[in-house]
Amino acid sequence: MRIVEISHDECKDLLNRVSVGRLACSLENQPYVIPICFVYEPDHLYVFSTLGQKIKWMRQNPKVCLQADQVGDRSNWSSVVLNGTFVELREAGEKEHARERLAKFSDWWQTPLAERRERISDLSIEPIFFRIDIASMSGLRGISEAE
């Protein structure tokens, strides 16, 4: 297997094809990584969540990293890593834009709400839309030697 860099355009193409990534945030030198569903738009990712550890941490330290990939097998894969800034959407128009973008996936709202309901007895769940403003992005691809 060879590992090669992929272009910026290939990174964007991958982010358009996948909808799940691993979001890393940190607070007081402690990292926290969780899977999230997202939708890509040039220079941004849009995400829907509920109030929990990641939101609390990102409100205090908005610098984040996200990794997303598409894996065929151990020798055929593509991966993108991006660094960016968490921006909580507060204006109605911004939230509606994020909701419209996320609605391309029929189940975009289910995971955060289902997870939250299982962890709390108080069902007063605060929906939160946020954006990750992308500062940098790079990617790699694993290629089988047979190719």
Annotate each PLM feature:
Residues 27, 68-70, 133-136:
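Short, structured patches in soluble enzyme cores that scaffold and shape functional sites
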Residues 1-17:
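Extreme N-terminal tail/first-helix region
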Residues 18-50, 66-67:
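Short beta-strand segments
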Residues 49-52, 64-69, 109-118:
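Short acidic (Asp/Glu) patches
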Residues 11, 19, 62, 78, ...:
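A generic secondary-structure signal marking the coil-to-beta-strand transition
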Residues 2, 74-147:
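Charged, gly/pro-rich active-site loop segments
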